């Protein structure tokens, strides 16, 4: 079977590598920015490629094609170009003036985006910035009484190891 994984983070790399290990004949990991913009760890990307994954960058999903039985048969993607770089150094993309590209596949795994619901924290007086809780290195949340935060809620998408380490710091 052929698999398309959509995303550029560690979960996307896990899905890509797991698909290969479970016997997929071809796995394409589709990401809308450049490979250097992926949030996955560099070694995860390199290991996925070493295992046979194809990393297709600067492509944004457009629509899924199904066969006459309703089964997935392709992912159509829109080529992207870099439009500019934001003040935080992140590249922004826009649609390229190119036709859609068809990527044949039997399965699509969507592994994009994760965020915390920060509204409730903000309403409780806990400072957030771009959806992440603002905490000190000790994991203490300034302006709160005995509130500590760590893991993805503070750093954004990262590894479980980092989240566990933050828990140990907060408990100390």
Q: Where in this protein do the model-derived segments appear?
A:
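Rossmann-like NAD(P)H-binding beta-loop-alpha module
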Residues: 1-24
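Cofactor-binding loop segments of dinucleotide-utilizing enzymes, especially the Rossmann-like FAD-
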Residues: 8, 31-34, 152
């Amino acid at each position: 079977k052929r698999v398309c994984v959509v995303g550029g983070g560690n979960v996307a790399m896990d899905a890509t590598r797991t698909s290969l290990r479970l016997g997929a004949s071809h796995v394409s990991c589709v990401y809308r920015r450049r490979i250097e913009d992926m949030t996955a760890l560099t070694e995860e990307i390199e290991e996925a490629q070493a295992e046979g994954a194809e990393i297709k960058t600067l492509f944004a999903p457009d629509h899924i094609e199904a066969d006459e039985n309703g089964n997935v048969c392709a992912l159509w993607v829109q080529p992207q170009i870099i439009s500019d770089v934001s003040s935080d150094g992140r590249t922004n993309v826009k649609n390229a003036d190119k036709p859609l590209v068809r990527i044949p596949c039997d399965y699509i795994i969507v592994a994009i985006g994760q965020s915390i619901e920060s509204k409730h924290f903000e309403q409780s007086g806990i400072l957030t910035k771009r959806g992440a809780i603002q905490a000190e290195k000790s994991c203490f949340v300034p302006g709160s009484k005995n509130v500590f935060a760590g893991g993805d809620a503070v750093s954004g998408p990262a590894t479980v190891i980092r989240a566990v380490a933050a828990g140990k710091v907060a408990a100390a």
